[in-house]
Amino acid sequence: MKQVRIMVLSKRKIKRNLFIILFSFIGLYLLISLYFINHFLFRTEINGVNVSLKAHRNFSNIISKYIREYDILIIERSGETEVITGHEIGMKYNNGISLHRIWCIQNPFMWLSSLFKSSKFYIKDLFIYNAELLDIRINRLNCLNREIINPRNVDFKYINGSYEIIKEIDGNKINKFYLKKALIKYISEGKRILDLDKMNCYEKPKYTASSKKTIKTKNLLDKYVSAKITYRFGKDTETLDAATIHKWLKVDENLDVIINNNDVAAYVRELSKKYDTVGIKRTFLTSTGKIAELQGGLYGWKIDRNAETEALINHIKKGDKIEKEPAYLQKAVSRYGNEIGDTYIEINITKQHLWFYKDGKMIVQGPVVTGNPNRGHATVLGVYMINYKQMNATLTGPGYEAKVTYWMPFFGNIGLHDAPWRYRFGGDIYLRNGSHGCVNAPLYLAKTVFENIEEGTPVVVYEE
């Protein structure tokens, strides 16, 4: 019985002690809470100023002291630093600002949780400064007054048939607008270390080595210089490849690849100068067995410079690897020898005679009357080609109109045709009663030539 009473008394004592501890803790918690009615909670920061456990009534003094000691450390990309003090910019405490909102937010009964969770507040215009003094101080910053290295985009370098990426240059040029904006933000928030790089105060290259556009541009450059165009000129060839193409390429500020059209046109122009044969000197074995030196005329190869320039640009853009002939305005029948081939009309002005050969065989020959040199109407010399042929044409000129059955022009309005008004051909008629420049032929001769000739057939006109 005695043991039972002792156990009951012990349990009552334990409960009483627990109640004492609990109410003591509650009482202590309430007492501490009463303290925080007029004090800031643990880990409280306002505009960068630590006011933990500080009395509300002392806030003005705390802030004023902070401002007197305030400075902001500016760290450059290079690691160099400089300091702006609050005094230099006329920094002051705006004592007209009310802290009532913060006091209301901070529940004094939540002081325990503030031990584990910080509270940071920002009050607009808590710190004020002289904007003019700030501008003056910014203008004096070393980082704005040393030798400037401008940022530069990534670049590309041609090496052995392809392009390498040359890394961009960050430089040290500061954007004054962003610098001022960052300073105002940091000063207003009471922050004391400004890293210019982290706050993006530097001018930056638009494109870096890791930009998607950079990779795209490199691939495009490599594609362009992979082109290989081999031009055929009979037995001769001209090859255009990366060694030349890369000199025509440029990358602009937006990393767009530009092909210099003028360079391409100049290349085609040089091909034209080298391989065009219109009007060149030619040797020709005449029907009388003599060697005639021919020069002038409209016959020969002639590259279409505009068309080939455009075609070549497209080949480069597609990275083509091809063999081709250039685009031509006109072609000769051959690239070999005198290029005349074995189908042609031969006109000997001295002998006033015409021969027509087809596939190496003479089809017809006969006397003709050419232009009167004594009246300024000499028939043109050189090598030409039949432009077209027409039956029943009417030829007109100053003071004449003539109807002919067979008309085969080879130089403007100069051509070969029948002349029904003539009864004699050959000899020296052309010196007295020659044509206005055309080659007059007997009907049979004109007819046979007309029936066997094709457009583009060479016409050789020479004097012995």
PLM ranges: what are they?
Residues 2-402, 406, 453-455, 460-464:
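Surface-exposed, secretory/extracytoplasmic low-complexity segments enriched in Ser/Thr/Asn/Gly/Pro
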Residues 407-461:
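Active-site scaffold segments
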